[in-house]
């Protein structure tokens, strides 16, 4: 992907607050299920903004930084998702979103960003991103990309 879209911490906070506004009234939600790992930070921000204390994770592995690979469900809450917000940072190809819809047909699926291939699978999102654009999330960057600690000195 030749194009890059960098999201700062300030941008992420703003986008998540906008997404939270669309989820009001907060009392309608039993909790938030954040999709690990990209949905963890947005999920935490939404939990704060909505005053939700019940936060859990859905652990689906399909990326290794910038390489998509086979999808593996590592951890999944039980139930059909009724009353829960499922939070992602980004819906790209839509593969993960399709899997989430299959697993939790009654949940509300939301994301901060969406690319055209997956946008229709979401109930709501904030930022449109071109399909050929790579997103650098604030937790992946400083002034430039920083390798995670566990990848140094290997």
From Swiss-Prot:
Describe its membrane topology. Answer: Peripheral membrane protein
State the reactions this protein catalyses. GMP + diphosphate = guanine + 5-phospho-alpha-D-ribose 1-diphosphate; XMP + diphosphate = xanthine + 5-phospho-alpha-D-ribose 1-diphosphate; IMP + diphosphate = hypoxanthine + 5-phospho-alpha-D-ribose 1-diphosphate
| Top enzyme category | transferase
Q: Which residues bind GMP?
A: 69, 92-96, 134-135
Q: Which cofactor does it need?
A: Mg(2+)
Task: Quote the InterPro entries the UniProt record gives.
Answer: PRibTrfase_dom, PRTase-like, Xanthine_Guanine_PRibTrfase
Where along this sequence does the record place binding of guanine?
Answer: 92, 135
Q: Which UniProt keywords apply?
A: Cell inner membrane, Cell membrane, Glycosyltransferase, Magnesium, Membrane, Metal-binding, Purine salvage, Transferase
The listed locations are: Cell inner membrane
Detail which positions bind xanthine: 92, 135
**Matches recorded under Pfam families:** Pribosyltran
Q: What's a GO biological-process term for it?
A: IMP salvage
Annotated metabolic or biological route of this protein = Purine metabolism; GMP biosynthesis via salvage pathway; GMP from guanine: step 1/1; Purine metabolism; XMP biosynthesis via salvage pathway; XMP from xanthine: step 1/1
Q: Which positions in this protein are listed as binding Mg(2+)?
A: 89
- The superkingdom of the source organism is Bacteria
What EC identifiers does the entry list?
2.4.2.-, 2.4.2.22
Q: What biological function has been recorded for the protein in this entry? A: Purine salvage pathway enzyme that catalyzes the transfer of the ribosyl-5-phosphate group from 5-phospho-alpha-D-ribose 1-diphosphate (PRPP) to the N9 position of the 6-oxopurines guanine and xanthine to form the corresponding ribonucleotides GMP (guanosine 5'-monophosphate) and XMP (xanthosine 5'-monophosphate), with the release of PPi. To a lesser extent, also acts on hypoxanthine.
Q: How does it assemble?
A: Homotetramer.
The record's similarity note reads: Belongs to the purine/pyrimidine phosphoribosyltransferase family. XGPT subfamily.
What protein is this chain from?
Answer: Xanthine-guanine phosphoribosyltransferase
Could you tell me which species this protein originates from?
Vibrio atlanticus (strain LGP32)
Q: Which gene encodes it?
A: gpt
């Amino acid at each position: 992907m030749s194009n890059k879209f960098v999201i700062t911490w300030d941008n992420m906070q703003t986008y998540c607050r906008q997404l939270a506004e669309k989820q009001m009234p907060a009392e309608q939600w039993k909790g938030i299920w954040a999709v690990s790992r990209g949905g963890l930070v947005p999920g935490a921000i939404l939990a704060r903004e909505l005053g939700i204390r019940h936060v859990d994770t859905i652990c689906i592995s399909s990326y290794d930084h910038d390489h998509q690979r086979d999808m593996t469900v590592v951890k999944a809450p039980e139930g059909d998702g009724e009353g829960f917000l499922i939070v992602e940072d980004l819906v790209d190809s839509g593969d993960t979103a399709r899997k989430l819809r299959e697993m939790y047909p009654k949940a509300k699926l939301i994301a901060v960003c969406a690319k055209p291939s997956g946008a229709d699978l979401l109930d709501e999102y904030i930022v449109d991103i071109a399909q050929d654009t790579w997103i650098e999330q604030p937790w992946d960057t400083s002034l430039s990309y920083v390798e995670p600690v566990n990848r140094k000195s290997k």
